[in-house]
Amino acid sequence: MPDNLPEAYNAVEWNNPDHEVLVCFASSWSDNGLETWAFALPTILVPFTGTGDFLSALVAAWYDPSASSNGMSPLATAVSKALLAVQQILLRTHIHALAQVTDTNDATADDVKSKAQVLRKRELRIIPERSLITEGGEGWPGSRVDWSNWA
């Protein structure tokens, strides 16, 4: 896990030892062989919709076969930037949803109507947080995977 996570990650208790970590891999093949990068991200254990489509769209938008950053392949660079934007938007969406909770039942809804209301509060805040996409950033830190020791 990166050392310098935003302070707001305390809102999701990412540093809890029982907390799940999501690992994303970006692999590409070139004349030099297989290159794989791994990115470890803290999970936000609440439902969101559209995250896969959003991540895919950002990777496609930022993929440039002639660009690389920090020794990463072009694909790993695009994935790194997309992961940073998605993580930041998910975190801000979650914090916004927490601020909208009006009673304890909002956080753990059981019936269909309540679940729909909870999900509406967790719609990705892409437009309000669009500066995270347009201004970009360096990207989410990753590590190159060495497959040479794997049999």
Question: Over which residues does each language-model region extend?
Answer:
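Short, low-complexity intrinsically disordered segments
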Residues: 12, 35, 60, 138, ...
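Conserved phosphate-donor
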Residues: 1-49, 83-86, 90-97
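Charged C-terminal helix
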Residues: 70-151
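A broad "ordered helical/assembly scaffold" signature
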Residues: 37, 58-59, 80
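Conserved active-site and cofactor/substrate-binding residues in soluble primary-metabolism enzymes
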Residues: 19, 50, 54, 73-81
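Short linear interaction motif-like sites in intrinsically disordered regions of transcription factors
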Residues: 15, 30, 63, 141, ...
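Short, small-residue alpha-helix embedded
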Residues: 48-71
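PLP-dependent amino-acid enzyme catalytic core
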Residues: 41, 61, 76-77
